[in-house]
């Protein structure tokens, strides 16, 4: 059981959040009247009161100074899994992300060399609306057993990211995942850039904690095909059987299947799989591996405990 010590809002971006006695939460926006609301996964930001109190040993800060909407006592929020669900009165929040990078002009970091929001702040979307008040209790709800597996899709394409070519593979993956029951949290289109890809893989696996990341493109022999190397650089455990199975299946269709350098790995509880770049090859490979992925993903997440066939 936790307690709301402060509710903070700001009417415009770039201005400090200040405490208010109450607020209205809506699924469409987040906190009514707060500039950082919208139709996205970071409608409401939360920070543990205990973390603010510890930071005050270095520098006194008011509630809202870190850009947080809700100051919550009684929970170490950043240690909870994504998604976690909270009830505040009639309102229900779904925690969707842990941490985010400070903006480039973070005054607190300039003063102290540190800011706790990137590692201690969490973000949520409003599942059910309601009015909340300072002093309200916040309850951690049981995670629903029927939640869909959560996925993200990344297309790697220099031409696609510059608007010179339509991305057909990414939307196809989203369509196939959705049809299979996955919830696709994000679909990104990036250039073949190692730094950008690594940043997004780390964010999706560590902060958003999606169950599955599928990349498309950048798995061949061209000089800018860097997807497998970046994928392996973020891996904590190898899962080579998936990439090997795709190569085996591709070889039954074309001898060029041997030219794929695709990797498949695990980072914490997130499975990352590299798919080819062409829509035809994406469809062929994903149709082949998709029926078996869910069991492996659930094992990695600790949701299934039995792997042997009966």
Where are these regions (language model features)?
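Proline/glycine-rich low-complexity loops and linkers
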Residues: 227-310
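Well-ordered alpha/beta subsegment
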Residues: 121-144
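Mid-chain, well-packed structural core segment of small domains
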Residues: 73-108, 237-263
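Solvent-exposed alpha-helices and their adjacent loops that cap or buttress functional pockets
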Residues: 15-18, 36-39, 115-118, 144-147, ...
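Glycine-rich phosphate/diphosphate-binding loop of Rossmann-like nucleotide-binding domains
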Residues: 146-192
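N-terminal small/polar loop signature for handling phosphorylated ligands or for N-terminal nucleophile
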Residues: 178, 184-215, 220-234
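Electropositive, beta-rich accessory/interaction domains or terminal extensions
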Residues: 1-92, 97-100, 131
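Short, structured beta-strand/loop micro-motifs enriched in basic residues and often containing a Trp
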Residues: 65-75, 114-127
């Amino acid at each position: 059981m936790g307690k709301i010590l402060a509710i903070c809002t700001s009417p415009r971006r770039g201005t400090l959040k200040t405490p208010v006695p109450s607020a209205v939460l809506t699924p469409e926006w987040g906190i009514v009247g707060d500039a950082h609301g919208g139709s996205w996964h970071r409608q409401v930001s939360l920070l543990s009161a205990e973390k603010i109190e510890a930071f005050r040993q270095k520098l006194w800060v008011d509630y809202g100074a870190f850009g947080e909407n809700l100051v919550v006592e009684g929970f170490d929020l950043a240690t909870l899994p994504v998604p976690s669900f909270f009830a505040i009165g009639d309102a229900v929040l779904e925690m969707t992300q842990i941490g985010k990078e400070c903006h480039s002009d973070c005054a607190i970091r300039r003063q102290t060399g540190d800011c706790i929001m990137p590692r201690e702040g969490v973000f949520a979307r409003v599942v059910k609306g309601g009015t909340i008040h300072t002093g309200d209790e916040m309850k951690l709800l049981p995670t629903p057993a029927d939640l869909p597996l959560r996925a993200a899709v990344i297309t790697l394409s220099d031409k696609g990211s510059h608007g010179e070519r339509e991305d057909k593979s990414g939307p196809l993956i989203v369509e196939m995942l959705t049809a299979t029951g996955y919830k696709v949290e994000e679909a990104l289109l990036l250039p073949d850039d190692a730094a950008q890809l690594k940043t997004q893989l780390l964010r999706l696996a560590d902060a958003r904690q999606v169950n599955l990341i599928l990349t498309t493109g950048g798995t061949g022999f061209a000089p800018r095909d860097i997807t497998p190397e970046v994928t392996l650089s973020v891996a904590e455990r190898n899962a080579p059987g998936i990439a090997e199975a795709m190569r085996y299946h591709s070889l039954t269709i074309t001898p060029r299947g041997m030219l794929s350098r695709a990797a498949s790995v695990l980072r914490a509880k997130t499975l990352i799989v590299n798919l080819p770049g062409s829509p035809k090859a994406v469809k062929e490979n994903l149709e082949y591996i998709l029926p078996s992925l869910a069991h492996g993903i659930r094992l990695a997440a600790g949701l299934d405990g039995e792997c042997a066939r009966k």
